[in-house]
């Protein structure tokens, strides 16, 4: 079997617009897992927001992994062991929050229970809470509150403003942070050099594998690096144009079993 690791973005990829895994896709993934494929749920979501889908796919039984915080952390679902961990630079939390306030975007991070932010009723903070089914805790000063290690800061704001904000942020924190959008209203900020691709490379090496053994499916800007890394990069029918351009294969959209169809084709049927 050529593809021994299968990395899947969640929102816009694995799940449909109702945030549900469709039956055909679920069946294809469980059969792939039974055949020994390591399924990696690779998302910008916090770990707690990925765990329900991991349980639904029985990844603890088959030895799959959770890649959370856009590559900030990887956990082995069977053992609970943390395989990869990247901490956000503590000295950059205050500058990122100051930048965010100036440009009228709302930063958030996470604790063991849910979201932590200064503006709990901001619309895209509430969207992040809805996606992950986690509570929001209000704090007066986010940098002062974060006295524990975090994996990322997420900036939320109006989709019309975010391309410009991302560009400015890339300039402001060049050489200090990895920055990308995961949705029109989200900007991910991670430790420098961290992404889905770099953490997947660590996982592959630990398994004695190479990117040629990786199949990755995604739709968003933050999926582009892992799509480029993978021996088989699959873009969803609803993917952003750069993802489609970089992919080896274009599948159906996330409402029409795009992941399931690709898994059937390249893993279960081993087409080339």
Question: Which residue ranges define each predicted feature?
Answer:
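Active-site phosphate-binding/coordination module
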Residues: 23-124
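Short active-site oxyanion
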Residues: 36-40, 64, 152, 212-213, ...
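Hydrophobic packing residues within well-ordered alpha-helices of enzyme cores
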Residues: 25, 50-54, 165, 169, ...
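Short, structured coil segments at secondary-structure junctions
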Residues: 57, 62, 70, 173-175, ...
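Conserved acidic, metal-coordinating active-site core of Asp-based
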Residues: 99, 103-217, 221, 229
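Short, hinge-like loop/turn segments at secondary-structure boundaries
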Residues: 56-60, 84-85, 124-128, 196-197, ...
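Mg2+-dependent phosphoryl-transfer enzymes with acidic/Ser/Thr/Gly-rich catalytic loops
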Residues: 1-5, 22, 188-272
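Asp-based phosphoryl-transfer active-site loop
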Residues: 2-18
